Amino acid sequence: IEVRANELRILAEAETPPFPIEENSKTKEDLRLKYRYLDLRRPDLQRNIMTRSRVATMVRQFLADEGFLEIETPTLIKSTPEGARDYLVPSRVHPGEFYALPQSPQLLKQLLMCSGMDRYFQLARCYRDEDLRADRQPEFTQIDMELSFVDVEDVLEVNERLLKKLFKEICNFDIQTPILRMTWREAMDRFGSDKPDMRFGMELKNVSDVVKDCEFVVFKSALENGGSVRGINANGQAGMPRKKIDALVEYAKGFGAKGLAYLAIHEDGS
C-alpha cells in the first residue's frame, strides 16, 4: 500500500542511543549503569528479571505448602554484633541516636520462634557495610527461614527439595539428592577453598609423609612449624617452559604465597 502524505509532523525526536539495545552487549558496564533504563531493555536482562520473579514465586509457594509463614521483620532495628559494619540511619525524633539496617534478621526470627511461630520465612533484604568483592555487595536479598523442634537433617532435607524443584522448573535440570556434602576441613584439604568448584580436577594432595625426611629448607621449615606440604598434579606439564613457570610463581605471589616449589617427573620416572 502506498500512502501519499501531505504533511509530516515529528512529535518526539528520537536521539541515537548511547549503545545498541541488544543481547550480549559489549558495552562497558559503567556506561550501561549510567543508562540503566536502556540497559534493562536488553533481552538477556529482561530474562534475568523474569527468572528472578519466577524463582521468588516458586519459593513462596513451596514454603507455604511446607507449613511456613511468610513474616516481614522490621528494617529499622537496634545495632547488634554481626560479621560486618552496620549501615546507620539517624533518628529525627531522638537526635544523636541511630537505627541500624539489618545485616540479617537473626534476632528477629529467634523472637518469632519463641513466640510460637514454628516455621517462618521471608525474602529478606540485608545490608552490610563491608569492602566490595566479586561476591559481596552492600545490599542483597536472601531466602531467610527458621524452624523449631528440628535437627540438622530436617533443615537440609527441606532445602534440598526446594533446590531440586527450582532447578527442575527453572532450568529443566534434575539434581541428585541428597546433595553431596563435605566438611569444611575436607573442602580446604582437597580444594583449598570453602566453596569449591567440584568440576576442578587438580585437587590438593598432602605429600607431607613423602617429604618428611627431605632437607629442602622450605618443606622442612613448614613441617617443623606444624604445617603441611601440599601440591597438585599438573598432568602432562613436565615440559613446561621456565618462562611459564616463572609467570605462575608471580601469579601465586599475588595471592600471598612466598613462591612455588615444583618437580618435573617424566613418564619414564626421570
What does each model-found stretch correspond to?
Residues 1-270:
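Class II aminoacyl-tRNA synthetase catalytic cores and aaRS-like
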